[in-house]
Each structure stands twice: as structure tokens, then as C-alpha cells.
Amino acid sequence: MDTAHKIINGYALTKQEAYDLYTDETIDTFTLLDEAYAVRKHYYGKKVKLNMILNAKSGICPEDCGYCGQSRDMKRKDRYALIPENDIIAGANAAADNQIGTYCIVMSGRGPSDKEVDHITESVRQIKENHPQLKVCACLGLANEDQASRLKEAGVDRYNHNLNTSENYHDTVVTTHTYEDRVKTVEIMKENNISPCSGVICGMGETAQDRIDMAFALKELDADSIPINFLHPIQGTKFGEMDELTPMKCLRIIAIFRLVNPTKEIRIAGGREVNLQSLQPFALLAANSIFVGDYLITGGQPNTMDYRMIQDLGFEIDCSNLPEDTAEKITETLEA
């Protein structure tokens, strides 16, 4: 195969070519992953970006997303409103202490109220004062122009709003908002010079064509960062009994997303531990970014395990926007 060589030299795969690569059973997954690694290495070397999530508001949501344990159909006991500013700031302090490059503040719900945006912006201003090098990502749901402008002014660097699935499959996943609603929010953030982060959830019953459509939709949207989540089935949700992924299938998905979006930050995100299992390290041959710590309502593995995984691969944490002593602190953590 010379796919990687062509891409590195400026060639862009067509949708049909990507589909053929992804579905051709004569192409071994590790062969495809090797092509993805060549592309990843060309653009990002062996560096890995670290991201951390704070669940700032949980379970209070009118939406019916079929994958989500915080949807309107789930009567969770651990629901809570937007947490105090001090707790949001404390989360950022913890992120900085753990050598994290991007701190993501996440809220459940359809979208933020203006009062909630005020709350977030005040928190972000203090975070930026304390940790000017820490990138702040907001994930607050559907947002409007005025809210985007205020978030930008406060110092928000990135906004996450996932497409989650293909346009064709969207209404099978959720009915309380449209695919176009999601695209519009990402476009609004771009118009306000906030870096767009948008990704997918795989393993919800979508087809191979849906996955290729997702990869190209994100390419067209020009998302700077693409988190790839793998369904972690939650009992009681629409997809709570779904179990169609294997570690090798997950690796193939990550590989094709890299080949379609060669220059973008591709992150292995929610569900990586339960779906990739012992093959987690191989995902970083195509992806160049991970979430560390816990997710929204499911647990992750200890940070030190991720640091060790990166080190064992011969890779290194991307410290480009972190304090100068970050690399030394990581080494001290691993040797402790």
C-alpha cells in the first residue's frame, strides 16, 4: 500500500476510496493501522496530547439521546445542577497538577442558559489567570452567537459539540434535536474564532457507510479536534444492550479517521478502556490525543497507567503549552 505516502504528499482520499479501504477484508487491520501511523508520525511525531473532563452539571437534560445515561429517560440519583465556580476552578488546578494540556468543562442539557454562561465565563477568567497556558474547552450543548462571543471573550479556547453519528443515522439516535442543530453550533463557534472540537460515538448500530460519512462530515466541518468515542452501553438506555465492537474493529475505525483527516487532532475518548481493552496502546499509532481520568458518568483508568502506556510506546506527552518543568514532573510521577 502507498496510501500514507500519497496523503503525506497532499492527496485526499475520496469517500469511495475510504470506504473501500475500510471495508476490504483482504486489508489487514494492522496494515491499515501502519498506514495511519505513517501519517500520524509525519504530522505529530510521537507526541500525545492530554485532555481532562469535568462534569460540571449532570443528568438534568430534556434530550432523548439513545446512548446517554443522563438523558431524560434516565432517572439518575446523582443528578446535580451547575457546580460552584470554586469547584470548576479546582478542577482546572487538578488538571494543571496532572500535566494536562486541555481542560474541558462539560454540562448536561440541551444548551446553557445565559446565567449558566455567566457562571462559566467567570470561572474561565479565573482559570486563565491562574493557568494562562492551560487550554480551556467548553462543552455546554447547543449555543447561540451571543453566548459564543461571551465564551471567546472570557478565554475559552475550544468548544466541543459532537456530531455523534451520521446525518443519515441521526434520527435513530436522538429525536429531540436535529443533525443541523449540531452542525450550526459548531459553525457558530468557528465564526467566533473558537477552535471547533467535534467527534463521534461508534458502536450504536451504524453501518460502515455511516462511519465513513461521519469521517467526511467532520472533514467538511473542518473540526480541529476529533474525539472518537466507543459506545459504553449503559443499562436502561436505548443502546444499553448493544455489543457490536471489538478491539480490532475500534482500531480500524481510528485508522480510517486518521487517513481521512490527516492533519487533525484525533482523540481516543469515552469507552476506550472497555472496547479497546488490551489493545489500547495500538490506538495511539493513529490517534495523537487521549482523555485521562474519568469521563462524564463512567470511570477511566488511573492517570499513571496512561502515562506509562505512552512511555512504553516510546511516545511522549505533548508539553508544548505546558510549564517548562512538566516533563520532569511526569518522570517523577512514573518513578514514584
Curated annotation (Swiss-Prot):
Binding site residues for [4Fe-4S] cluster: C61, C65, C68
Cofactor note: Binds 1 [4Fe-4S] cluster. The cluster is coordinated with 3 cysteines and an exchangeable S-adenosyl-L-methionine.
Reaction(s) the record says it catalyses: (4R,5S)-dethiobiotin + (sulfur carrier)-SH + 2 reduced [2Fe-2S]-[ferredoxin] + 2 S-adenosyl-L-methionine = (sulfur carrier)-H + biotin + 2 5'-deoxyadenosine + 2 L-methionine + 2 oxidized [2Fe-2S]-[ferredoxin]
CDD domains xref list: Radical_SAM
UniProt-annotated binding residues for [2Fe-2S] cluster: C104, C137, C197, R267
UniProt superkingdom: Bacteria
Record-level Gene Ontology MF annotations: 2 iron, 2 sulfur cluster binding; 4 iron, 4 sulfur cluster binding; biotin synthase activity; iron ion binding
Cofactor list: [4Fe-4S] cluster; [2Fe-2S] cluster
EC number: 2.8.1.6
GO terms under biological process: biotin biosynthetic process
Enzyme class: transferase
Pfam families: BATS, Radical_SAM
Pathway membership, UniProt: Cofactor biosynthesis; biotin biosynthesis; biotin from 7,8-diaminononanoate: step 2/2
Subunit structure comment from the entry: Homodimer.
Family classification: Belongs to the radical SAM superfamily. Biotin synthase family.
Record protein name field: Biotin synthase
Lineage of the species this protein comes from: Bacteria, Bacillati, Bacillota, Bacilli, Bacillales
Gene expressing this chain: bioB
